[in-house]
Amino acid sequence: MSRPTSSSESGIEEGLAFQPRFDASGLVTCVATDARTGDVLMVAHMNEEALRRTVETGDAWYYSRSRKALWRKGESSGQVQRVVEMRTDCDQDAVWIKVEQRGAACHTGRRSCFYRAVTRGEGGEARVAFVDADRLFDPADVYHKKS
């Protein structure tokens, strides 16, 4: 990984160097999908250290904005993500990882964090409906707190 320079726009888009562009908070957005099915599992953030550890270990590492801490996916729950492939977008400010997900990806115990569909109600208002919402584990048991 190297830091982009202001004159390397074409290098960012067409070059072979991985030069992630971190935002003002030092983060890039990461989309994690199931390598086998293509289903979106979660969206999280990585700082430089999380990105480096992900590349080095092959396990998904993230940065928690709420806890302001680095964490390895599955550290507490055992629901590990093994990275099969990592891609970056055209301007290298986001990454996409295809993972082998063991168990649930969501801290709510569900396979994916995207377990609710936004639908249009009879009056035209946006509503939420549960889809693919079965829990694979009880968060209270895994994290020892109320869900």
From Swiss-Prot:
Binding residues annotated for Zn(2+), in chain numbering: 90, 106, 113
Pathway: Amino-acid biosynthesis; L-histidine biosynthesis; L-histidine from 5-phospho-alpha-D-ribose 1-diphosphate: step 3/9
Biological process (GO), any one: L-histidine biosynthetic process
Cofactor list: Mg(2+); Zn(2+)
Enzyme type, top EC level: hydrolase
Its EC number(s): 3.5.4.19
Pfam family, one: PRA-CH
Transmembrane segments: none
Gene Ontology MF, one: phosphoribosyl-AMP cyclohydrolase activity
Listed InterPro entries: PRA-CH, PRib_AMP_CycHydrolase_dom, PRib_AMP_CycHydrolase_sf
Primary location recorded for the protein, binned into one broad class: cytoplasm
Function noted in UniProt: Catalyzes the hydrolysis of the adenine ring of phosphoribosyl-AMP.
Family: Belongs to the PRA-CH family.
Protein name: Phosphoribosyl-AMP cyclohydrolase
Organism whose genome encodes this protein: Nitrobacter hamburgensis (strain DSM 10229 / NCIMB 13809 / X14)
Top-level taxonomy: Bacteria, Pseudomonadati, Pseudomonadota, Alphaproteobacteria, Hyphomicrobiales
Gene designation: hisI
